[in-house]
Amino acid sequence: MKPHRHQNKNLTLCGNYSLVIALMASKTEPLPVAEQRRMTGRLLVGLEDMAKSANPGLDSWRDLADCMNWLESAVEMGWVDDADGAVEAAKAALLDGHSNANKHGKLRMSGPSLVGMRNMVEQFGELLQVMTARNYWTVVGTGEKRVSAIWRGKKKAGDVVVTL
């Protein structure tokens, strides 16, 4: 059966921002536990794929990049403190995977890069448990606007665009 154009294909890890979703989200409760587990599980599978798979998939890399972009948006908004540099470590790890893809044809990450990504995934999981659903969706919307601005050519210092 042919899929319809209007079907939601949950391609992004964090979901697609909608004002209605953001307004309907709880101001006091975090995201449902099932949704938190889905996201962190998807990230852990992606991390495992990057570490052990013979040919790591592009979806795993995208999920990890979505997580990094979400965390970077939360830090820019001032809602998350990144004293340990998890965002920069994750950005360096993603660039490491990209350079390995250019050199060897595989999205492989080195050991230190995997440690940086694991720290980012753990921080993301902890934030999902304490951040309200409304704040989560606000960060998603801000992140989408930030990425859209980058694609339009409005880069800030530290922004990196990688195409695979």
Which role does the model predict for each range below?
Residues 1-3, 50, 98, 158:
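Compositionally biased, intrinsically disordered low-complexity regions used as flexible
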Residues 1-17:
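Short Lys/Arg-rich cationic patches that frequently serve as NLS/NoLS or arginine-rich RNA/DNA-binding motifs
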Residues 13-17, 32-43, 59-67, 110-116:
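Short amphipathic alpha-helical heptad-repeat segments
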Residues 20-55, 81-108:
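Short, flexible domain-boundary/linker segments around small modular repeats
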Residues 44, 48, 65-68, 72, ...:
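Residue-level detector of alpha-helical secondary structure
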Residues 55-76, 107-127:
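Extracellular/lumenal glycan-associated surfaces
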Residues 78-84, 131-136:
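HEAT/armadillo-like alpha-solenoid scaffolds in large eukaryotic assembly and transport factors
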Residues 101-164:
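Amphipathic alpha-helical binding modules
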